[in-house]
Structure formats: C-alpha cells, structure tokens
C-alpha cells in the first residue's frame, strides 16, 4: 500500500500556487525518491498508476503540475497559459519542488525523470 499527499508550493517566480502530488510507500526504509517532470499539455494525475507501481516497490514519487497545466492555474480558463517568466519560471518551479523534497526527506537524494517536454527541463537543471 501507499499514501497519497497533495499540496501547493508557492512559485518563487511569481507566487503562483504549484500543485504537487506525492505517493509514499507505507513501509520504510524507502529505496529512493523519484521526481517526475511531465510533458507539454499533461497533468500530474496521468502518472498516478506509475507512481503507485513504484511506491509498491519502495520508492517515494513526487510530481507537480507545471504552470498552466492541471491544477497549477489561477482559473480554469488559464489552462495552457504559463503566466510570466516563461521557461525560466518553469525551471524555477522544478527547483522549488526539488528543494522541498530535500527538506522533507533529508536522507535521500532525489532522482529526476523527465517525460517529453520534461526531458529538456530536467537536463537543463541537472
């Protein structure tokens, strides 16, 4: 089994609430942490089955909705609109989520995995 946690983290770029989802195994010690970065026009819940699969194998999985995606919007009409800051703001949001992971799970070094658009963004950060 695993537990799901949802929260919002404030973007350092412009104060936008970034929606974050974590799936945490019930048993410890954890085998590791996986930070997922979704692609363009996607949303975090799409990866929930994979996150649950990995949690059953001992991995903490964390993903967030990019600005303008899923629940990281100020209004539903803003889906697809990334607000100010462009790519720099998206990269900053990924870093903020990563930093929060480090603070919450200090004994682990997270792995980042990008999917489609996320591949380019994680390569830029790593």
Predicted regions and their residues:
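Alpha/beta-hydrolase active-site loop
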Residues: 82-105
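N-terminal cap/lid segment of alpha/beta-hydrolase-fold proteins
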Residues: 1-27
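Structural motif
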Residues: 31-33, 115
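Glycine-rich anion/phosphate-binding loops
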Residues: 42-46, 89
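Conserved alpha/beta-hydrolase
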Residues: 46-77
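Hydrolases whose catalytic domains are alpha/beta-hydrolase-1, hotdog thioesterase
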Residues: 121, 125-126
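Alpha/beta-hydrolase fold nucleophile elbow
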Residues: 105-120
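Active-site glycine-rich loops that stabilize anionic/oxyanionic intermediates
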Residues: 34-42, 120
């Amino acid at each position: 089994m695993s537990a799901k946690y949802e929260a919002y983290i404030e973007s350092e770029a412009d104060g936008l609430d970034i929606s974050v989802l974590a799936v945490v195994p019930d048993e410890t010690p954890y085998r590791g942490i996986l930070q997922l970065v979704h692609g363009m026009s996607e949303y975090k819940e799409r990866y929930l089955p994979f996150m649950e699969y990995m949690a059953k194998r001992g991995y903490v999985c964390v993903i967030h909705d990019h600005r303008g995606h899923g629940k990281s919007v100020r209004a539903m009409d803003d889906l697809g609109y990334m607000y100010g800051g462009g790519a720099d703001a998206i990269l900053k949001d990924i870093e903020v989520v990563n930093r929060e992971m480090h603070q919450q799970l200090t004994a682990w070094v997270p792995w980042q995995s990008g999917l489609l658009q996320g591949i380019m963004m994680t390569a830029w950060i790593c």
